[in-house]
Regions:
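Motif-centric detector for short Cys/His coordination patterns
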Residues: 1-73
Protein backbone atom coordinates (compact mmCIF):
# COMPACT_ATOMS: atom_id res chain seq x y z
CA UNK A 1 0.00 0.00 0.00
CA UNK A 2 1.42 3.36 -1.02
CA UNK A 3 1.01 6.50 1.03
CA UNK A 4 -0.76 9.39 -0.71
CA UNK A 5 1.18 12.65 -0.97
CA UNK A 6 -1.50 14.86 -2.51
CA UNK A 7 -5.05 14.71 -3.82
CA UNK A 8 -6.84 17.28 -5.95
CA UNK A 9 -10.45 17.11 -7.16
CA UNK A 10 -10.97 17.41 -10.90
CA UNK A 11 -14.10 17.69 -13.04
CA UNK A 12 -16.36 14.77 -13.92
CA UNK A 13 -15.81 12.85 -10.66
CA UNK A 14 -12.08 12.46 -11.06
CA UNK A 15 -9.25 12.91 -8.57
CA UNK A 16 -5.62 13.68 -9.31
CA UNK A 17 -3.67 11.60 -6.80
CA UNK A 18 0.09 11.65 -6.24
CA UNK A 19 1.58 8.74 -4.32
CA UNK A 20 4.75 8.58 -2.22
CA UNK A 21 6.60 6.90 -5.11
CA UNK A 22 5.90 10.11 -7.14
CA UNK A 23 3.43 8.29 -9.39
CA UNK A 24 0.49 10.48 -10.41
CA UNK A 25 -2.85 9.07 -11.42
CA UNK A 26 -6.14 10.48 -12.52
CA UNK A 27 -8.68 8.31 -10.73
CA UNK A 28 -12.24 8.21 -12.04
CA UNK A 29 -14.44 7.53 -9.02
CA UNK A 30 -17.75 7.70 -10.94
CA UNK A 31 -18.10 3.90 -10.69
CA UNK A 32 -18.76 4.27 -6.95
CA UNK A 33 -21.48 6.93 -7.23
CA UNK A 34 -24.35 4.41 -7.40
CA UNK A 35 -23.25 2.52 -4.29
CA UNK A 36 -24.85 3.29 -0.92
CA UNK A 37 -23.49 6.41 0.79
CA UNK A 38 -21.18 7.17 -2.14
CA UNK A 39 -24.26 8.57 -3.90
CA UNK A 40 -23.70 11.69 -1.77
CA UNK A 41 -20.53 12.38 -3.78
CA UNK A 42 -22.66 13.31 -6.78
CA UNK A 43 -22.76 16.69 -5.04
CA UNK A 44 -19.86 18.61 -6.59
CA UNK A 45 -19.46 20.80 -3.51
CA UNK A 46 -18.96 17.71 -1.34
CA UNK A 47 -16.64 15.88 -3.72
CA UNK A 48 -14.43 18.99 -3.87
CA UNK A 49 -13.87 18.72 -0.11
CA UNK A 50 -11.73 15.60 -0.51
CA UNK A 51 -8.71 15.46 1.79
CA UNK A 52 -5.62 13.34 2.11
CA UNK A 53 -5.55 10.96 5.09
CA UNK A 54 -2.24 9.26 4.29
CA UNK A 55 -3.30 5.82 3.08
CA UNK A 56 -6.73 6.95 1.93
CA UNK A 57 -8.69 9.95 0.73
CA UNK A 58 -11.69 11.05 2.77
CA UNK A 59 -14.69 13.35 2.58
CA UNK A 60 -16.48 15.19 5.42
CA UNK A 61 -19.31 12.62 5.42
CA UNK A 62 -16.70 10.00 6.48
CA UNK A 63 -16.61 8.24 3.12
CA UNK A 64 -13.15 7.14 2.10
CA UNK A 65 -11.23 5.27 -0.58
CA UNK A 66 -7.96 3.52 0.19
CA UNK A 67 -4.78 4.08 -1.77
CA UNK A 68 -5.01 0.45 -2.96
CA UNK A 69 -8.46 1.11 -4.41
CA UNK A 70 -7.26 4.31 -6.08
CA UNK A 71 -4.35 2.43 -7.66
CA UNK A 72 -6.76 -0.15 -9.13
CA UNK A 73 -9.15 2.30 -10.81
Amino acid sequence: MFRIKTVKPLKEYKLLVEFENNERRTCDISQFLNIGSFKELRNEELINQVRNEGYSVEWPNELDLSSDTLLRI
